[in-house]
Amino acid sequence: MIDWHAIDTVLLDMDGTLLDLHYDNFFWTQHLPRRYAEIHGGDPERINDQLMSRIMAEKGSLNWYCLDYWSDQLKLDIIALKREVAHLIAPHPSTNEFLHALKASHCDVWLVTNAHRGSLDLKLEHTDLGEHISKIISSHELGIPKEDTEFWRKLQQHWHFDPTRSLLVDDTASVLDSAAAFGIRHLLTLRQPDSKQALRDSLT
């Protein structure tokens, strides 16, 4: 149980936390391989395997999240392709109620995401997340992903917050680990970031 009297700042992840991760998973594993095959030619199944291998090689780095990087690497307009399936962008069922409650509280609410600005802008366009958030910060602004403890140091340097009185809600184990190592005291995660996938028993 969270002691809200002990929290001044709430740091919220976006993809998989406030928004259903199904959109992102569908885009990268199904829509992108199909459209790549249509544009560049080739067998979609083989292309899917090749793309997943290239993408997974960047996991945990800023490139993993960078639409400019993937547009350059794949010779595609990734943002335009993401718009093609933007109808799948959706908040989790409890998101709006949670955000309304936070807005009515004493807490300062920040969106802290690894999403590239192009992806972030698209999702803000298709949701009302921005109405409930006082600060929106992409890790691309700081040049380092949330998986790195240095990210949290830079975040605090730019926008002061007390880690001992902050809550981070995130669906990624490595992000929660880096935040804990930095000293963020209150951590919370979700058991089902993607509504089309099974509940997680743990973060491992």
Q: What residue ranges belong to the model's regions?
A:
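Asp-based, Mg2+/Mn2+-dependent phosphohydrolase catalytic module
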Residues: 1-10, 100, 116-117, 121-204
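Short active-site oxyanion
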Residues: 106-110, 163-166
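N-terminal helical cap/lid subdomain that shapes the substrate entry/recognition surface
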Residues: 2-97, 116-118
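Flexible coil/turn residues that form the inter-helical turn or adjacent wing/linker of helix-turn-helix
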Residues: 63, 105, 172
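Residue-level marker of regulatory loop/turn positions in helix-turn-helix DNA-binding domains and
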Residues: 91, 112, 144
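Catalytic-core regions built around general acid/base machinery
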Residues: 94-106
